[in-house]
């Protein structure tokens, strides 16, 4: 790597320091291209502090380079620099967090940090997303910190670092990594699998067993709410960040109103993590459960953030230098112009959203996939097209049908209102939604099948506030029944999501009933809704949320609707999977509206005054029945997904 001699480890010999060096060498050569590594070195060494021959970064250098607001910036209320520095100091010691954490941010440590946070370790280690979650938890856990013994040399360097740095590291050791002999049963059989894979790749299993015994202490450690809130607020602000975009494009406009919106979303996400039984902190069990199931893309913004290390503005690799050849490998330069606002995900149309604020869009990207690929909504380059809003199109199912049934793509339903019967928790405003990757169909009781192996093709029902809750789509083929569509609407009963639709009846009006773990029903006037959620039930469209326990009662909320919005999911033209030109959902909808207008004009010209049995009369009646405008056959009016 250019910072030391690379030597291979024979057998099981070697110290943790040497093994850490070898792993960093392997990461650098296999996880980065030569050009990326050149840029990485320039970024690091051009800014590093030289203390007794050791080059390293302190907290201020790291925060300034990444553009992360910290306590030194009195004009910015987002103080996330110390949290990121703490995480990096922990991850830099991988896979020997017990012995080497907190690590000095040398080049080798930063290489490991960049590989782990950009998820490039798959070229050296087997992919293990769950184990990355444990590493992230360990890097954030600060309840019950302790002083870690270190060799005199390392301690001297750390002392010199503190003396020479204007900003302290805030990292004094990690109780999360203290070996313990407490018996926690088989709570997590694959602890430290990612670290184990690293040592397996170095033929150093014995060293691993000596340094990092099965560590059950992790289940006693906690992440403080204050620490996690600061990280969440940063992730919300930089969620739309693209590779090599400057962070300041998103952090420079943090006025009071923007920060209030960011805090609100952070608090709704925090509410999903159980802290009642954790002494005010977040336990590993809660952290791992929620981040892996209810917030699978929460840490995605860290990838483009740390990819900034792989491009240096000081280098122009396309020019000749003396007799050197032109470097053919290219890397995209970051734009100097301000980055786009998160709201640019919304395309212009018939209305502007009163629900989709930038912070809400960021919140959605933490758990909603792109319909075209298994990445989050923002990284999948999706756009949202305004399809229907009660504020503009009125509270009528006729208008809903005209706008939604003609949309031939996936949709996102959002609902904002007030709980009409506040619970003992004092809930007031609530924001709900449903992600429906399949288009609505005009045929009654139809059901679009999904691919169980493709999570992006599964629907989900969610609550954004006051508490983040996600009901994932059920991948079981057994729940795909004609009378249990994902979403259904009828002019007689309204809109039903995740419900069982009763058979038609001439004698009485039967309404859809909740099925499985969750459902949402909206009345025919689009004025009120009922949200149903249970901790049990695997026989419906949606599975129970990870944020509830088996002991919790079924939740039923009656909601007075303030705003109902439907947004169409539109992929970027450049992301179209087919090389053949194809009409977009927007163009198809316009074509359907034009067809409906022509048919309406044709119906106006029909002679309905002809005598009984007249062929014109029969033809007119047939046309109107076919259009579903007259006739009393059961199920004639309605639609579903």
Curated annotation (Swiss-Prot):
It is found in: Cytoplasm. Residues 149-168 are annotated as: Disordered. The keyword Cytoplasm applies. GO terms for cellular component: cytoplasm. Pfam families: TLD. Residues 354-570 form the TLDc domain. Keywords: Cytoplasm. Belongs to the RTC5 family. May be involved in a process influencing telomere capping. This is Restriction of telomere capping protein 5. It comes from Neosartorya fischeri (strain ATCC 1020 / DSM 3700 / CBS 544.65 / FGSC A1164 / JCM 1740 / NRRL 181 / WB 181).
